[in-house]
Amino acid sequence: MDTFLFTSESVNEGHPDKLCDQVSDAILDACLAQDPESKVACETCSKTNMVMVFGEITTKANVDYEKIVRDTCRGIGFTSADVGLDADNCKVLVNIEQQSPDIAQGVHGHLTKKPEEIGAGDQGHMFGYATDETPELMPLTHVLATKLGAKLTEVRKNKTCPWLRPDGKTQVTVEYKNEGGAMVPIRVHTILISTQHDENVTNEQIAADLKEHVIKPVIPVQYLDDKTIFHLNPSGRFVIGGPHGDAGLTGRKIIIDTYGGWGAHGGGAFSGKDPTKVDRSGAYIVRQAAKSVVASGLARRCIVQVSYAIGVPEPLSVFVDTYKTGKIPDRDILELIKENFDFRPGMIAINLDLMRGGNSRYQKTAAYGHFGRDDPDFTWETVKLLKPNA
């Protein structure tokens, strides 16, 4: 049997880049909760004893940026300098300006345009992907790496493994076969976990606890065999972590946020951006389109691309490829997609309810992936049943 190996990685919520994504999206949530028309482009960076938020925000909301930063860091578990950041005593720097009036007039006419007239907030191209290899219609490598990261955080917060600290990374290699263009997982080849830990735990206990409390509950037993390779904290020491170990920045984990290296990526990040930014809303609508194609049984695997020009509502192009797994020709699937999905940014925001913030709606997306999540707030995961035209 001809097989190949493919690998995806993830980082958990205490990774410095992911900390920054969560702060940026927590600020977006706060703005949209009070003013759904908020225009937000919020970046965050962090290093030892410091978090800075900066960017362009035009909103009627009254937002306490410093409180949001501290609350978000505290919620992740950054409560002392020992673990990488002290939420209550670190420096918080804020440099927020209004959205450029040049952009405002071109995109939304200073809030005068109707939803169907709102232009894209920038140029760019976005991809959506779906595959039938998991119930989530997501790549197995990405699903397993992401779930390992989430489980690491769970057993840290519930004190199952009290030696754990917030920062951590995971990586999973799966052996696949190609079945006429569809991806069929055979076995897990390698599992890698590097997690921050306290001074006192031994490497032997780290390995034993990770196997028992993280790997065993997450990796389906049918994918493990006696040849599966485990690299558990292979560097031998990971005490210094979080922003103390590495600088963090919003938008540096775009593959972890999407499909783990499968499909394709247009390069635009998600976090801290309101729905007029097609980097986010465009990527959400093409995920819904690709997922709907696979869920409707029209293909086993699907990628959809959309592209935009700044200030122009209609997309410049829509593309679909089913990797030769389509039950009908790709050109017919493309027509179905165009008939069933409105790619204009203002209409995406309405149809996917993207102007609703608050209750950590966007902050939730900023750790453990934007796609394949079973959560009603992830409206783009809702399948539209697509039926071929007679």
Swiss-Prot record:
Signal sequence, start to end: none
InterPro entries to which the protein is assigned, alphabetical: ADOMET_SYNTHASE_CS, S-AdoMet_synt_C, S-AdoMet_synt_central, S-AdoMet_synt_N, S-AdoMet_synthetase, S-AdoMet_synthetase_sfam
Alphabetic keyword roster: ATP-binding, Cobalt, Cytoplasm, Magnesium, Metal-binding, Nucleotide-binding, One-carbon metabolism, Potassium, Transferase
This protein's record includes keyword rRNA-binding: no
Positions that bind K(+): E43
Catalyses which reaction(s): L-methionine + ATP + H2O = S-adenosyl-L-methionine + phosphate + diphosphate
Role, per record: Catalyzes the formation of S-adenosylmethionine from methionine and ATP. The reaction comprises two steps that are both catalyzed by the same enzyme: formation of S-adenosylmethionine (AdoMet) and triphosphate, and subsequent hydrolysis of the triphosphate.
Annotated protein name in UniProt: S-adenosylmethionine synthase 4
